[in-house]
């Protein structure tokens, strides 16, 4: 027998970083809030993506940087201890338990219902037990809003034999407790580049198969070129213009994988990772009960309210709305959406939805920051030169060799990197900045502030970088721009 409906002001589907942030904002607005989660509180990022992947990458990148420092390289000449790296990774993900996250939820006054949540009509969510048993269904009713924060899952291509071959997705690649002797990585994006870096550093013989022309093609072209150059020097084989037509594991679970290419060539590996994109977790959310198509991305307005839903009670934040598939950007959307839900619940007559307003996700279009944790690191925000030109903007592009900055010279021998600033000539401020080089991740927020703040070039001239730091690249870019 079903329980009587439970009423909350806000029901959130998905307890990843996006759902947690949205719930935190609605609680801050004084709204009762419950999160529904079928797996671990903390979500994909905490257990199978951002946190474990960077835990694997940190020792690999630290060793690479140490090897460039005179007097230190001999001390780090040996192989990494995979066992210690895995133990550190496991600690960072709480050994795939969510006790710490539960403590935070309780402290924030957010309720949790474990199970699979599906929409059951306007402002109603039906929750079935997480183990898939035939236990009682629980129905939650939202007085003001339901927020879908269910994220995405790995998208596997429709290839013969792929299901039986049990390939790695990003989940297996970040949680494996053994180092495959041979690893084939299919894809050329961020996950492919990072996992090729990590597993090569841990001792795998890695082959990367890229259907397109190179790595990281959504960023400035020189980024992927520099990353590929270093990977090849480290022994990674990168094949571009290469497509896979089949995969098989004929020997069973413990046997090798055979990857068949379009040209008929066969590659044998111990594991194959498909890093070929993401698909939204919307196929079993009951979207059809509110007039939406299951399985697709949810289209939202600037407040993350789902379009074409009568009553305006349904929101979608994070990867599921396809605006910017990055954890930090999803958390940003969650803060905006949570504030909008709170304002509407309080009958605020006019929300601040103008550009850069309190209830507008403007940064999704103008200032999305991203770091790729490879060697060298890639850090970018805003538009590339190609994207700016496609929008019809009048721009000027300024490039600088980061290896010429004194801070980079001191950072390590043979520092290789490049910086680019894209300036909107009509507005007089940067609309895109890209850094490639060891340690540039920590430079990115300065660029994000410049782009999101629309800081004029003439004002940036007065932002003096400390000497001798790598951040002096800002001065070099501005000098090149001013002439």
Which functions belong to the PLM regions below?
Residues 163-179, 266-357:
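FAD-site-proximal beta/loop scaffold in flavoenzymes
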Residues 27-45, 204-215:
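Glycine-rich FAD pyrophosphate-binding loop
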Residues 86, 91-98, 174-175, 180-184, ...:
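Rossmann-like dinucleotide-binding cores of NAD(P)H-dependent redox enzymes
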Residues 13-39, 51, 55-62, 368, ...:
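Flexible, glycine-rich terminal cap/loop adjacent to redox cofactors
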Residues 11-13, 117, 140-151, 185-186, ...:
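Short hydrophobic core segments
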Residues 2-16, 179-189:
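Beta1/beta-strand and adjacent pyrophosphate-binding region of the FAD-binding site
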Residues 75-76, 111-114, 118-133, 202-302, ...:
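A Rossmann-like FAD-binding core segment of flavoenzymes
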Residues 2-8, 45-139, 219-245, 385-387, ...:
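N-terminal Rossmann-like dinucleotide/flavin-binding domain of flavoprotein oxidoreductases
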